[in-house]
Amino acid sequence: MKEGIHPNYREVVFQDMSSDFSFITRSTIQTKDTIVKDGKEYPLAKIEVSSESHPFYTGTQKIMDTAGRVEKFRQKFGNKLGKAAK
């Protein structure tokens, strides 16, 4: 293999921001954040959904509005529901 053309493959901590679940795996992701886990410093990749918080894996239905989409929809359309929706 050629030297210097491949990304750095290293151990990274992925942290689920909705459930505070984290796991260590190997990745080439580039991050500026770091975290100390098990006495060692790792790069930190923040994710919104993992197997610990996804409804398919947990079996529970949960509304996750991380980007404010529901409020944006309500501001745009308000309570203008049709007769069929009531």
From Swiss-Prot:
Query: Under which name does UniProt file this protein?
Result: Large ribosomal subunit protein bL31B
Homology family: Belongs to the bacterial ribosomal protein bL31 family. Type B subfamily.
UniProt GO molecular function: structural constituent of ribosome
Please name the InterPro entries in this protein's record.
Answer: Ribosomal_bL28/bL31-like_sf, Ribosomal_bL31, Ribosomal_bL31_B, Ribosomal_bL31_sf
Q: Which HAMAP family match?
A: Ribosomal_bL31_2
Q: Tell me the name of the encoding gene.
A: rpmE2
Assembly and interaction partners: Part of the 50S ribosomal subunit.
Q: Is the keyword Phosphoprotein assigned to this protein?
A: no
Superkingdom in the source lineage: Bacteria
Which source organism? Answer: Cupriavidus taiwanensis (strain DSM 17343 / BCRC 17206 / CCUG 44338 / CIP 107171 / LMG 19424 / R1)
Which terms are listed as keywords in the entry? Answer: Ribonucleoprotein, Ribosomal protein
Instruction: Give the Pfam families listed for this entry.
Output: Ribosomal_L31
A Gene Ontology cellular component where this protein is annotated is: ribonucleoprotein complex
Disulfide cross-links: none
**Any one of the GO BP annotations:** translation
